[in-house]
């Protein structure tokens, strides 16, 4: 005879990606306009008033357009506080509200509240060494 065993499987919990790419690189310098001009002249950056924007495609299928912003800030900016570092990285994320809830449960320091603009939602957190990180859920 044949023996049959019923297999029961638990539905797999599919978690949304947290970080999908680098959304921006921000750093302090003495003269942001001069720094931007240097990068334009010597490295060919196509600059805008905020620095430059790099366009790329997210994922292997190359259908979802994404951007990374490169921006120099004045060395006197307070924008990176409470971090004492001269840089801040912006990470593109999916479902920022859900991610922030998860990070709170993981005891990650959330610096501020989620702000929404016409180009996406933003919040700042601190990493394990106190570096301020910007999380961005773009509206693509």
Where are these regions (language model features)?
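Vicinal oxygen chelate
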Residues: 1-30, 49-50, 77-140
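Core segments of cupin and vicinal oxygen chelate
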Residues: 16-20, 26-71, 105, 121-123
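Short linear motifs in intrinsically disordered
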Residues: 43-46, 91-92, 112-115
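Short secondary-structure boundary/capping segments
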Residues: 60-63, 78-81, 114
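A short, sequence-level motif marking secondary-structure junctions
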Residues: 72-77, 139-140
